[in-house]
C-alpha cells in the first residue's frame, strides 16, 4: 500500500510504501493546496511555454496585502465552460472538490453578486429558502463539503433530492452524474467490490 503526504503550503508530494512486482497500474488523485495559486503558476508556465513573455512570478491575488484595482479591465481571454451537466458528472463521479468550490463561486457570479464564496452562499440560501428549507437546517461553510463546519439535516437532503427528482429538466442529468460504487472514480471507487 502507498501513502501520499504533503506538508501544508508545499508542492512536494512524498510517496511512501511498497508496490508488488505484479501490481496493476493505478492512479491516485491528490488535492492541490491552494487552487487559485496553483492555477496562477500553471497559467504562467503554459504562457511561457507558448512563447508569451511573462514578467514577475505567478501570484495568488488573495495572498496580496494590497489588492489591485481591477476596474475597468478588458478580458484578454474568454472560456466558455462545458454544459453544467457535463461538469456535474466530473464533480460527482470523481469527487472533484475544485469543481465544487468553483460551482459555489459561479453561482454567486451568475446571480450578479460577484464570483466569490460569500455571494454563492447568499444565492444558495435564497434558492433553498424558496424551496421551503430554512437556514436553521444547514451551514454551508464551503463548496466542497470538506469543512468540518458544514452540516445539513436529513430533511434538507431529502427535500433537495425529491425536488430534483420531480423536475424533468434536472432529474436525468442529476441521476447520470451520481457516482456508482466500485465503478466510478473518486471516493467510492474501491467500494462494493466484494
Please describe what each predicted stretch is:
Residues 2-168, 172-173:
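A small/polar active-site loop signature that marks catalytic segments
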Residues 131-134, 180-194:
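Active-site Gly/Thr loop motif
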Amino acid at each position: 500500500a502507498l501513502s501520499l503526504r504533503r506538508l501544508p503550503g508545499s508542492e512536494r508530494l512524498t510517496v511512501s510504501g511498497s508496490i508488488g512486482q505484479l501490481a496493476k497500474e493505478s492512479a491516485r488523485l491528490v488535492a492541490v493546496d491552494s487552487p487559485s495559486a496553483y492555477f496562477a503558476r500553471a497559467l504562467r508556465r503554459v504562457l511561457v511555454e507558448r512563447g508569451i513573455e511573462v514578467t514577475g512570478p505567478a501570484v495568488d491575488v488573495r495572498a496580496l496585502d494590497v489588492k489591485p484595482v481591477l476596474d475597468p479591465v478588458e478580458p484578454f481571454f474568454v472560456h466558455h465552460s462545458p454544459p453544467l451537466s457535463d461538469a456535474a458528472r466530473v464533480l460527482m463521479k470523481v469527487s472533484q472538490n475544485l469543481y465544487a468550490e468553483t460551482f459555489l463561486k459561479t453561482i454567486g457570479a451568475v446571480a450578479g453578486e460577484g464570483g466569490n464564496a460569500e455571494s454563492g452562499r447568499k444565492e444558495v440560501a435564497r434558492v433553498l429558502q424558496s424551496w421551503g428549507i430554512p437556514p436553521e437546517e444547514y451551514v454551508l461553510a464551503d463548496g466542497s463539503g470538506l469543512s468540518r463546519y458544514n452540516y445539513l439535516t436529513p430533511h434538507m437532503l431529502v427535500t433537495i433530492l425529491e425536488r430534483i427528482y420531480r423536475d424533468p429538466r434536472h432529474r436525468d442529468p442529476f441521476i447520470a452524474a451520481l457516482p456508482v460504487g466500485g465503478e466510478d472514480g473518486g471516493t467510492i471507487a474501491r467500494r462494493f467490490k466484494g
